[in-house]
Swiss-Prot record:
Pfam family for this entry, one: tRNA_U5-meth_tr
Binding site for S-adenosyl-L-methionine: Q190, Y218, N223, E239, D299
Gene3D superfamilies the UniProt entry points to: 2.40.50.1070, Vaccinia Virus protein VP39
Domain of life assignment: Bacteria
Protein's UniProt name: tRNA/tmRNA (uracil-C(5))-methyltransferase
Taxonomy of the source species: Bacteria, Pseudomonadati, Pseudomonadota, Gammaproteobacteria, Enterobacterales
One of the record's GO molecular function terms: rRNA binding
Native source organism of the sequence: Shigella dysenteriae serotype 1 (strain Sd197)
Annotated active site: C324, E358
Catalyses which reaction(s): uridine(54) in tRNA + S-adenosyl-L-methionine = 5-methyluridine(54) in tRNA + S-adenosyl-L-homocysteine + H(+); uridine(341) in tmRNA + S-adenosyl-L-methionine = 5-methyluridine(341) in tmRNA + S-adenosyl-L-homocysteine + H(+)
EC number assigned by the record: 2.1.1.-, 2.1.1.35
GO biological process terms, semicolon-separated: tRNA methylation
Length: 366
């Protein structure tokens, strides 16, 4: 695979290899055949980051080869959304011959939605001033004149200039209902929107008919908790990043959901609060004991669950675990399988043509 060529003819084979690999990894814990969810074979990534290379008068996007660390010029990127590809061309054309926008520009980040909105961030090794803002506003207006619904942001050390706004609103069709998700620049969002829809629908399916409340750790912008709110009496969710919490609060209102409570704290802190080890001012007015959480949802970082959180989740009858790293999932299952068994197993091809796998398991108490 090269950045400008996807081996789409190999899609089925690479997916089949992942299924076999996941089954092998999960064999000590389950003999289930994974439910398999396919990605679009191209234009599936809704975000991308590129370094910018200055070559005489020329200017272009590059990425670095992971093995050799050599530079690879990238003029098109079929893994990314069609809107990102349009913007890549338009941004280079708009910046290449503009000394103010070009000088000391070293990276461009793109974030797009299925609803065809975009935030583009330009990163600089220099101070950004009013002249930069004026030129950036002219570029933004020129892009919009090309029917590109784009917001521009300039970033430098300790500086962030958002010309209009630093977010876009995604609209996802999930189980016959449109979900609105505010996505903030430089915050985590699911990279493959088509796969995200399938993950949300799978999570809804495995939790249908649920009793009681849902507890979610690492909720981000509320991606899963808002979609799952329909299946539970109440949802209590934690997230540490301020921009994500603010986006989640907006998303609760935008989707007219009244049974979700977001708390800004780390999973480890919440574990301490639940166990009565510490009290937190942030929890004033929230009666944790009133929640009857029969199900806990975790979507941890690549490092998986820490040992304290492992112990904490074992107290719940049902554990829904979305993993972006099956190796750490299996490490966690060494502990979780002592008290729970795997009821459902899914493979989500979030990153086609790469070694990476995303998977989901539903665990129920033995």
């Amino acid at each position: 695979m090269t950045p400008e060529h996807l081996p789409t003819e190999q899609y089925e084979a690479q997916l089949a290899e992942k299924v076999v690999r996941l089954q092998s990894m999960m064999a000590p814990f389950s003999d289930l055949v994974p439910e398999v969810f396919r990605s679009p074979v191209s234009h599936y990534r809704m975000r991308a980051e590129f370094r910018i290379w200055h070559d005489g008068d020329d200017l272009y996007h590059i990425i670095f080869d992971q093995q050799t660390k050599s530079r690879i010029r990238v003029d098109s990127f079929p893994a990314a959304s069609e809107l990102i590809n349009q913007l890549m061309t338009a941004m280079i054309a708009g910046v290449r011959n503009n000394p103010v926008l070009r000088h000391k520009l070293f990276q461009i980040d793109y974030l797009t939605t299925l609803s065809n909105q975009a935030v583009v961030s330009l990163l600089y090794h220099k101070k950004l001033d009013d002249e930069w803002r004026q030129e950036a506003e002219a570029l933004r207006d020129a892009l919009r004149a090309q029917n590109l619904n784009v917001h521009l942001i300039g970033r430098a050390t300790k500086t962030k200039i958002a010309l209009d706004q630093d977010y876009i609103d995604e609209r996802l069709p999930v189980a016959g209902k449109e979900m609105i998700y505010r996505q903030v620049e430089n915050s985590f969002t699911q990279p493959n929107a088509a796969m995200n829809i399938q993950m949300l629908e799978w999570a809804l399916d495995v939790t249908k008919g649920s009793k009681g409340d849902l507890l979610e750790l690492y909720c981000g912008n509320g991606n899963f908790s808002l979609a799952l709110a329909h299946n539970f009496d109440r949802v209590l969710a934690t997230e540490i990043a301020k921009p994500s919490v603010a986006a989640a609060q907006y998303n609760i209102a935008a989707n007219h959901i009244d049974n979700v409570q977001i708390i800004r704290m780390a999973a480890e802190e919440f574990t301490q609060a639940m166990n009565g080890v510490r009290e937190f001012n942030r929890l004033q007015g929230i009666d944790l004991k009133s929640y009857q959480c029969e199900t806990i949802f975790v979507d941890p970082p690549r490092s998986g669950l820490d040992s304290e959180t492992e112990k904490m989740v074992q107290a719940y009858p049902r554990i829904l675990y979305i993993s972006c790293n099956p190796e750490t999932l299996c490490k966690n299952l060494e502990t979780l399988s002592q008290t729970h068994k795997v009821e459902r197993l899914a493979l989500f091809d979030q990153f086609p043509y790469t070694h990476h796998m995303e998977c989901g398991v539903l665990l129920t108490a033995k």
